[in-house]
Curated annotation (Swiss-Prot):
Component of the eukaryotic translation initiation factor 3 (eIF-3) complex. It holds the Pfam family Paf67. One of its GO terms (cellular component) is eukaryotic 48S preinitiation complex. The keyword Transport does not apply. This is Eukaryotic translation initiation factor 3 subunit L. Keywords: Cytoplasm, Initiation factor, Protein biosynthesis. PANTHER family: EUKARYOTIC TRANSLATION INITIATION FACTOR 3 (PTHR13242), EUKARYOTIC TRANSLATION INITIATION FACTOR 3 SUBUNIT L (PTHR13242:SF0). The lineage of its organism: Eukaryota, Fungi, Dikarya, Ascomycota, Pezizomycotina. One of its GO terms (molecular function) is translation initiation factor activity. It comes from Neurospora crassa (strain ATCC 24698 / 74-OR23-1A / CBS 708.71 / DSM 1257 / FGSC 987). Disulfide bonds: none annotated. Residues 255-449 form the PCI domain. It is found in: Cytoplasm. Belongs to the eIF-3 subunit L family. PROSITE patterns: PCI (PS50250).
Length: 474
């Protein structure tokens, strides 16, 4: 059993929704059941009141917090979530309630992580500024509020309690998931919370910068249209955004483009049927994903779906052209697009309020790592434009064209040669893949002589005509 399930509610002043108050209600109910014959009417009234209270708390957990909410409200919201999850996880036996709606579980996990993310960013900003003594004092007194450990503990506890990973593994083997669900996992409330907690872990680990672990969490979920997350538009979009971004940061650009392309095509084809608030919430993420595709295509030129290609040209046409040219002029474009499209990274530990200058901005840290990769590949387009003109070429001659030292050029060529080999996911876990050559230009160094070969793939016009005819007459 996880530490969260064994832990008690936070030690701050008890509010009406605290764990202690909830346990008192449960104990009162037990005593009334023992004397059911003497006080049946009182028991029914207590049960009805308790059920109404829980239902209202379930509904409230999915409601977004006001963006301008003060620190006390953020603390209170954290306490409310702790109280609710403590009750769901620690009750004697599963809570026999149905979620208010089919997408309620996603809304709860989504809002829970959003508040954790926004609170962490807010706390870090207050620490860096160091001029609000009152809020700094409050944050010092409550270092574990919206802590990374407690949030991860909730998500892992919900997954463990629902046995959702065992259920998903059974489904992959074409077995009955009910056989391994247990008394908690058989309840829709636990099953849905556990399932979307897996998507939540993908998101949290990405925010913390652990991209490999983020992808590892989805080992038991199949990325296809039949998956449970695909039924909720916001969950569908979020999953592919964070998977694609993790692939991009791991330099698996082909897989990143594949993930981004899938969801963007899906959104473009279903936008006329999606009129709810969940669809409206992904509009900004949609533009961010186009920015990420522009970055990935600049690193690894590839043919895109016509719908995506057209939208990309409309949104980022000028920037994409500069990225594809490469050179120092492309650096500020890469930085601008990354800042626009990256998640709001957070630190796993509270900031240092005593030494504000010692706090590192997580976004700046990951931007620095990303820009190191950009600088390594900065001259790729220029180098390739020369190599395409020859079948063999002297290293010193190419260095003269580029106005760099031969040994520096040799280092670039070796690094970029290695970059053309990438893992490409086909099946199994998202970290797995087949090592393939993702470039149409290959070369080998023999001393100072560069041997170049180019594979040109002709456009499949038949497929192009069929796609456009089907869209015209659909």
């Amino acid at each position: 059993m996880s530490a969260f399930q064994q832990a008690q509610a936070p030690a701050r002043a008890i509010d009406p929704d605290s764990d202690v108050e909830e346990e008192a209600l449960v104990n009162d109910y037990k005593e009334q059941v023992q004397y059911e014959e003497d006080d049946a009417e009182s028991t029914q009234m207590s049960l009805a009141a308790q059920t109404d209270d829980i239902q209202s708390r379930l509904a409230a957990a999915a409601q977004p917090l006001d963006y301008s909410a003060g620190l006390e409200v953020k603390f209170s919201s954290y306490d409310s979530y702790c109280s609710l999850f403590h009750f769901i996880l620690n009750s004697e036996g599963p809570v026999d309630l149905e979620p208010p709606s089919y997408y309620w579980a996603w809304d709860v996990i989504d809002e829970f992580i959003y508040q954790f993310n926004s609170f962490s960013s807010y706390r870090a900003r207050i620490a860096r500024q160091g001029n609000n003594e009152e809020e700094i004092a409050m944050l010092r007194e409550n270092p574990n509020t919206w802590g990374c450990y407690s949030v991860l503990n909730v998500l892992y506890s919900l997954i463990q309690k629902s046995q959702i990973t065992e259920q998903l593994a059974a489904m992959k083997r074409n077995e009955d998931p009910a056989a391994v669900a247990g008394e908690y996992g058989s309840k829709n409330l636990y099953k849905m919370l556990g399932y979307f907690s897996i998507i939540g872990l993908l998101r949290v680990h990405t925010l913390l910068g652990d991209f490999s672990l983020a992808l590892k969490t989805l080992d038991d979920i199949e990325l296809n249209k039949k998956a449970m997350f695909a039924r909720v538009m916001a969950a569908h979009f979020t999953t592919y955004y964070y998977v694609g971004f993790s692939y991009m940061m791991m330099r698996r650009y082909a897989d990143a483009i594949r993930m981004f392309s899938h969801i963007l095509v899906y959104v473009s084809r279903t936008k006329n049927f999606q009129k709810n608030a969940q669809y409206d919430s992904i509009t900004k993420k949609n533009d961010q994903m186009y920015a990420l595709i522009a970055i990935c295509v600049a690193f690894q030129p590839t043919r895109l779906d016509d719908t995506i290609h057209t939208a990309l040209r409309e949104k980022y046409g000028d920037q994409l052209l500069k990225l594809q040219r490469g050179g120092p002029e492309a650096l500020p474009i890469y930085e601008e697009l990354f800042r626009t499209a990256c998640p709001k990274f957070i630190s796993p530990v509270p900031p240092n309020f005593d030494e504000p200058e010692a706090n590192i901005d997580p976004i700046e840290h990951h931007l620095s790592v990303f820009m190191d990769e950009v600088k390594t590949n900065m001259f790729n387009p220029t180098i390739k434009s020369y190599l395409r003109l020859y079948t063999t070429m002297d290293l010193k001659k190419l260095a003269g064209f580029l106005e760099v030292k031969p040994e520096e050029l040799r280092g670039w060529l070796m690094v970029n040669k290695q970059r053309t080999k990438q893992l490409r996911w086909t099946d199994g876990g998202l970290l797995e893949g087949e090592l393939v050559n993702v470039s149409d230009l290959d070369y080998a160094l023999q001393g100072d002589l560069i041997h170049i070969s180019e594979a040109k793939v002709g456009r499949k016009l038949v497929d192009w005509y069929l796609r456009n005819l089907s869209r015209t007459y659909a």
